[in-house]
């Protein structure tokens, strides 16, 4: 008899979902359940929309055309055709599709917005979103084609096609399924659009929010790796822990700096390989004057690690605060206020400027942190700077074996590529017959941020492989004197990646380790 998989934990959606819960649902680790109060809000919202329709109110996208065609009034008998045509003309995306988790994060973001009860979406539409999230499927959504201004119209239109069985699905391993096969395999009912369902589904910042959600999750893992690897670097280079003292961070109390310094200190606890004494405790006499073999302070890539890492962590924290608000916000237009004070409100909650700016800021922080890791690799592999380790950490005869020389150059190339693109949000371009005369480009910002996160992961993977080699070269295969945390880290790496005894191709190992770093924090 086949063993049954344990049921997934349920995340109950009312007014608020946090980023960890959202990622659990998007990544298939939890199922989503609509809380009774949210269901009641959505039913009330649908009822308010019904009253608007019966009273023939002048409401954008319900009794009007779209965008600059909003001055064309539409009769009630054409509402279904209007909604269908909205999806048809918007489903114009191109480029590679969003990955499985990111596409599901987009679906979840749309559901959370609609569940606030101000969009008038039908109960059946909400059920189709929930069913898709609780399946093992994702919509196949082209990644390019949205300016993130009237929300993410284009990618969300492709989501609607998928829900209708007219677009493709992705299964968990990325295999593409046609609409009919996806509906069958997921045991899904095809979506039937009514009233303004199409506009409620496409008009919002859900694609950029979904991408940003996955970005945030990846950055948390990579940030943990950056701390762990910096601590191990200190052990390999006989680094000084004085610069990580709590008293320094107390005098400059940025939360990220304090956190980074504390975690660095914890990682080297029990190490005999770092220098712990305070320089100023030494008293000089006449015989001490002159040049010492080593400076009393480390280079900035070690000494200033709490400040550099901490600034990045504070940027991520700001990104996460903004993202949490955006995820739980109503980003539709028009909206139907729950208090019923007016039939509908027309505005611009679909403008993705918050996600655009925070994604650009996070991309900048990621590039800075990748630059720190690249400089750490350079110092570790340079025999003039690595305090007695062999050049490029080779084990065989120098010259015959080049060690990590190629990998070090790859790290430099990756960083150069990260620096080749700047912020997206400053490049607003008027479009849509000047109706959208300013646009956020938030989805582009989030996508570019993701590309930089992937490059950072690859640089950290190179650093990790170099450090495992350096630790064994410095301390022997038994890792004598290395901290317990450092030993666990090297041993975990060695379970998958053997020492570089002689030169071998490293590209596949770097890629595999980078994927691991994005998904799991260090031991």
Swiss-Prot record:
Alphabetical UniProt keywords: Lyase, Phenylpropanoid metabolism
Gene3D superfamilies: Fumarase/aspartase (Central domain), Fumarase/aspartase (N-terminal domain)
Catalytic reaction(s) noted: L-tyrosine = (E)-4-coumarate + NH4(+)
The keyword Lyase is annotated on this UniProt entry: yes
Binding site for substrate: 89, 303, 432-436
EC supergroup of this enzyme: lyase
Impact reported for residue 89 to F: Abolishes tyrosine ammonia-lyase activity. Increases affinity for L-Phe. Increases the low intrinsic phenylalanine ammonia-lyase activity about twentyfold
Residues the record marks as active site: 60 (proton donor/acceptor)
Superkingdom field: Bacteria
E.C. numbers: 4.3.1.23
Cross-link 5-imidazolinone (Ala-Gly) mapped to chain: 149-151
SUPFAM superfamilies: L-aspartase-like
Recorded GO MF terms: identical protein binding; tyrosine ammonia-lyase activity
GO terms, biological process: phenylpropanoid biosynthetic process; protein homotetramerization; tyrosine catabolic process
Function per UniProt: Catalyzes the non-oxidative deamination of L-tyrosine. Has very low phenylalanine ammonia-lyase activity (in vitro).
PANTHER family in the cross-refs: HISTIDINE AMMONIA-LYASE
Family under the similarity heading: Belongs to the PAL/histidase family.
Record note on quaternary structure: Homotetramer.
UniProt name for this protein: Tyrosine ammonia-lyase
Lineage: Bacteria, Pseudomonadati, Pseudomonadota, Alphaproteobacteria, Rhodobacterales
Encoding gene, per UniProt annotation: hutH
